[in-house]
């Protein structure tokens, strides 16, 4: 894998002249250049550059991508990289991402153009995944370093990393090991080359040695700066998700369009009501429309007063507020059947201000088509002419209004704009009901609903439904019909095992969407050993990816064995073990999540349409977006806008949405945010192409967690 390399030195002036860069740009002391807030990504189609572009997409940071494998692609030259605007030199990109430290052929004019550009304008370069070699500021990995897998290894942010771009992390950077039988990582660990100006930001132990090798570090040379990454990753792996923010902050100097935060919200459905219980003998849920066994007797699961105390104590301990989606009929019926007594409702109402509340309709009725439940699975009932029979507008409106009226009379701190229908009904549900109930949009309008919870597993994209925007919610795979761990595991086994193993065979019939377990889980240990780790990892993955969508569970998960808490604690405790205090979990209510999703979509649309202009000149940042589209920016602490403080603090930076009226917005950076000075003398060193690097199959395609090792 090692290659012998020779270098050739050229004076900066000679190289710039040869490339035809605008006169005077090598000496920027006369007129400070304009640097556009856009990233250039040169891709080889590999997972590392794809991961970085995915992070830029999530944040809303604009970039131009050039795929080296595409015929007829854009040639990288001086004219492509820089020009002059109104007499001022302009750098068209604030940062460059390459697949490695030199992905071009020997003697490449494109690599020379990039090197000259970076030096001239002080533009940083990210080597997304490169071999450890002297040309990247490191000793050759084959000479006392390490080349191989790092599955399960606990890397760490160095002191320099914490003081620099990775100050939002607490220290540990654990590498995934989802399946011991699959290689999910590969890295080249090494130490700085002799005489190299290299600072490691993230490192790991070199196997068999007492020293640690760099995984991410900054190499300063020839008037240029490179972030050298010597391990491969994909956009879903935890090790990348932890470092993604820092990579973007390093390459942009903390000045860029777009922003990300880490969100986590938990909706608890069916509060005040009860949920039907899984029957391990009948393998169905008595009381549910799909359980037609004549011997099926419902055995409901309902919270009690002690569960309320546990929930409020948990909220205080974790710093997260639960959103309770309530059905008032649950307590109305409970009091009617028990001489006015409902200890659960009394406890919840006594602590009502400690929760957020969402209207979940009065009776949890199905609000789509009229269901024919005489068949399994159910189907939509039809009129005499064969058309679908829909739940009427009056019924939908009554469900919404009656529940709201009860909540208001009980003094619940409601947001009347929010609604979650029972089972997300009214909206389309495949295969039985392929379209929305046409009466739903009108009912939403009549009741002032603008934020409507939906099921992310059915419809992951936000959409408009009448006056409302949907808020897709992630279902947590802790079943609504299980109050005890043994019940959860029994139903899990029924769904995910083959018929020959006593299961339903659903996984056999639907291999594209469901994977069969190799064997049934132990009902005593399977929940803690497999289900909790899987659900924790999934939810934590959403959190680490900057996804604001909420997760939903059911009130049955907060009682009896309190099945939800091991998952929720795993997510929040796991998060806090990885992140510094300046990067807390952001816990929004549903309406605010919907607004965040809407703003992101509008911002992405504006970026793709080329409707956003943003650049930096010295310590002034100018951003102009289309009228009515909020502008997203991330800037250093101390930034001001019109003399007032800008944004809110998160992860050591300031970020925020600013409403746009279509005119330029000017922000002033603090004096500490000095742009990297361009080099004006010395030589540039041309290097040979970077050696090939290994990319395991377990990185190309994300490996499912076996959760059993």
Across the structure, where does each feature detected by a protein language model lie?
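Secretory targeting and sorting signals
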Residues: 1-28
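An acidic, glycine-rich "communication" segment
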Residues: 29, 123-206, 627
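Extracellular ligand-binding/catalytic regions of CAZymes and related secreted enzymes
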Residues: 30-32, 213-214, 218-318, 561-593, ...
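Metal-dependent polysaccharide deacetylase catalytic core of the NodB/CE4 family, i.e.
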Residues: 38, 101, 118-121, 128-141, ...
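Helical hinge/lid and interdomain linker segments adjacent to catalytic or ligand-binding clefts
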Residues: 40-128, 133-135
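C-terminal domain-boundary segment and adjacent tail
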Residues: 67, 244-265, 309-330, 408-410, ...
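Active-site-adjacent pocket scaffolds in enzyme catalytic domains
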Residues: 138-139, 190-203, 208, 212-224, ...
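Catalytic grooves of carbohydrate-active enzymes
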Residues: 221, 231-234, 248-277, 401, ...
